């Protein structure tokens, strides 16, 4: 067969245009199928919810993490701060590590786990308030739980606290977190480091009052990475006893206006 110029042009189109496009489409389809493929979450032990509790604090660690790094220590501090004979409160350091490791799936799995938890928690007849705290991809556990809980029990007051939250949802929606974090809660605050390289973890979250704790890290000369630093800062904040809490202050938006960024240049001092 004699190859004319038209044949070579067709071959070039196939090699340099059609094949890359087909490969991209096929690769994207495989990635999205993996990202959104259903799972039953049987490897995760759902927390027992005390049916008589009036207040719940739930802490969700981030991608590839476990409660041991900061969530479990925070649980201990919070239990010391909020427990009293007249006030029943349950503090949960959620272990969802079996589903938090994938950079593509952690937001999707976190949201689904949050939705399931919200439906369960909504059945607690005595429940009055919930404080949700999430780091990195754990922000989606917080968002999902808030959404499903409010859908069933809008009477329950919800505070959501986001620590260096990841904005990307499902490897596709880059601004999902920025647009949705804090939008279903009665009050929401975020703690970010502006030098964090993770998308969404380094900027104002419009539906929250955002604390920029970058200067506090620099002032203490901390060796912790910008993505981890907000968890450490929040631990110190809770330990100090001066952290924002709907349990103690009903109108937090008056003190911490929504949609504003506040710079913090030092660690909090204990009361």
Where do the language-model regions lie?
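N-terminal membrane-anchoring alpha-helices
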Residues: 2-42
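Predominantly extracellular/secreted Zn2+-dependent metalloproteases
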Residues: 46-49, 240
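Proline/glycine-enriched tight loop/beta-turn segments at coil->beta junctions
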Residues: 49-55
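A conserved mid-domain beta-alpha-beta active-site/ligand-binding segment of alpha/beta enzyme cores
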Residues: 210-243
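Alpha/beta-hydrolase-fold serine-hydrolase catalytic core, especially in secreted/extracellular enzymes
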Residues: 231, 235-271
